[in-house]
Amino acid sequence: MESAPDAEEARTVREALGRYEAALEGAVRALHEDMQGLQRGVEQRVAEALRLAGPLARTVAELQRDNQRLQTQLERLTRQVESLGLTTGLAPAPGTPSPPPAPGVPNRAPRLGTARFASHATFSLSGRSQSLDHHDEASELEMRRTSNSCIIENGHQPGADPGDGPPEATQTIPAPEPPKPRPVSLSLRLPHQPVTAVTRVSERFSGETSATALSPTSAAILGGLSSSPSEATTPWTPSPSEKNSSLPRSLSSSGFGAMTASRNNNSPPLVTPPQSPPSPQPPATTQAHRPGERRRELVRSQTLPRTSGAQARKALFEKWEQDTAGKGKGETRAKLKRSQSFGVASASSIKQILLEWCRSKTLGYQHVDLQNFSSSWSDGMAFCALVHSFFPDAFDYNALSPTQRRQNFELAFTMAENLANCERLIEVEDMMVMGRKPDPMCVFTYVQSLYNHLRRFE
């Protein structure tokens, strides 16, 4: 009895194990199928990637070959440029040793001619604005060197001649420091200023120079150095040629000298030749007040706007008109207004030109008298005559009547629209409503449109 249940239980266990093994085999089989499907998908993607990467690899190889070819060409061009530079002398030869640079000076010589040219061009452009100052400084240093050398030579002379002046003047030569005017910069900048500014500058410059130069020590120097007066007076004032060169050609040298002499009657004539003895010093009060006034006048003259030739002529005419005080005042003013408005077409002139053109086209037509752009066009006959002058076969003008206004407007507008492609900017009803005095602007606008379309058929 006990063996039967054991056998039944063993059979049940074997059946359960069989079912479990079958389930495991099915799961493993499904897993193998999934792995095979995944492998096939991966293989397909790898094959597609290889298929796409093939042209890319070929392109990369071609680019590498092109790069090598370009490098070869670049090397060849470099050698050609170097040989060209050697033939033209723009660069030193590689085998020839360059001279050693000076001690303390860096070697900044460029290797190619283009770099040297660019550096020179940059230097010239950047230094152009400072050329005047450099020139002034160079001239000032040259004058100072000349005066210092002259003073040293006179100071170290073992003996002085009787004609050279008293020994007091010789001993006081190295003591004073001469002022440093810049006549070169003054003459260079004067042509850009008005004539009044030029006069004020020269007047102030001569006044201040005389006030500074004619001190007691300087007077002794000027009186003592009779053997070399040009060296003593040259650094102080510019020459008359330099002053006169800055003025316009309309002012002569004699006129400028007279003007300067008349305004500086109290100051010594420093423009005269240096052999003339200096005049006595004016009072100190006059010298104290006049430079300030002249400086204010100089600032006022320099702030004036630069006038052109036309503006100068206009100002001259206006001044002449004020001076005449009514003589020919109306005629001159009319001429000035006409000259000011010359070349500017006004609305009235355009209307007059268009009206003259309409008169020339409607000359000889009956019932047409063009005097304006209002009542002369009120009956429609002017429109019909203008269109008929360009298209005489379109209609019979002699059959029209000024009393039939609506018919005239309709005929003229229709023919202009059909034959000249001119749109109706005015309606017939509007012309009928406006009566015998239509709006001049409406009529002028439509006539201007007719002119633009009809002139093509002239």
Curated annotation (Swiss-Prot):
Residues 158-167, 209-220, 245-254 have a biased composition (Low complexity). Pfam families: CH. Keywords: Coiled coil, Phosphoprotein. Residues 24-88 form a coiled coil. Residues 348-455 form the Calponin-homology (CH) domain. SMART domains: CH. Residues 94-104, 270-283 have a biased composition (Pro residues). PROSITE patterns: CH. Residues 87-111, 123-142, 151-312 are annotated as: Disordered. It comes from the Eukaryota. Residues 225-244, 300-310 have a biased composition (Polar residues). Residues 131-142, 290-299 have a biased composition (Basic and acidic residues). The modification Phosphoserine is found at S98, S126, S131, S252, S254, S267, S276, S341. The modification Phosphothreonine is found at T96, T272. PANTHER family: CALPONIN HOMOLOGY DOMAIN-CONTAINING PROTEIN DDB_G0272472-RELATED (PTHR23167), SMOOTHELIN-LIKE PROTEIN 2 (PTHR23167:SF37). Belongs to the smoothelin family. This is Smoothelin-like protein 2. It comes from Bos taurus.
